[in-house]
Amino acid sequence: MKKIEAIIRPFKLNEVKLALVKEGIGGMTVIKVSGFGRQKGQTERYKGSEYSIDIIDKIKIEIIISDDKVEKIVETIIKASKTGEIGDGKIFISSIERVIRIRTNDLNFEAL
């Protein structure tokens, strides 16, 4: 099993979600996150002074899937979230050792 974590632009969430549902993804975790990187943020004015805001709001989605679906799901996320501009986000892929559904004690794929 793999965990895919994708940091995307907030306005791309619905498009990504719909694309993932089309690929058979039945659920995901969505988290509001903030961070900085190459996008550099923006400059705003307040009472005549300029302020640099370098922490940008993003959305992080997490999905647990079987190893054989990773490449297709990564392609789907990229296609649905890409604008071609700095700040489109990142995708992280990691191994998951075990999943347990708390209510039923189901394990691994039965728990998803």
From Swiss-Prot:
Gene3D superfamilies: 3.30.70.120. InterPro entries: N-reg_PII, N-reg_PII-like_a/b, N-reg_PII/ATP_PRibTrfase_C, N-reg_PII_CS, N-reg_PII_urydylation_site. Keywords: Chloroplast, Nucleotide-binding, Phosphoprotein, Plastid, Transcription, Transcription regulation. It is found in: Plastid, Chloroplast. SUPFAM superfamilies: GlnB-like. The keyword ATP-binding does not apply. GO terms for molecular function: ATP binding; enzyme regulator activity. GO terms for biological process: regulation of nitrogen utilization. The modification O-UMP-tyrosine is found at residue 51. Its main location: plastid. GO terms for cellular component: chloroplast; cytosol. Homotrimer. P-II indirectly controls the transcription of the glutamine synthetase gene (glnA). P-II prevents NR-II-catalyzed conversion of NR-I to NR-I-phosphate, the transcriptional activator of glnA. When P-II is uridylylated to P-II-UMP, these events are reversed. When the ratio of Gln to 2-ketoglutarate decreases, P-II is uridylylated to P-II-UMP, which causes the deadenylation of glutamine synthetase, so activating the enzyme. Belongs to the P(II) protein family. This is Nitrogen regulatory protein P-II. It comes from Pyropia yezoensis. The gene is glnB.
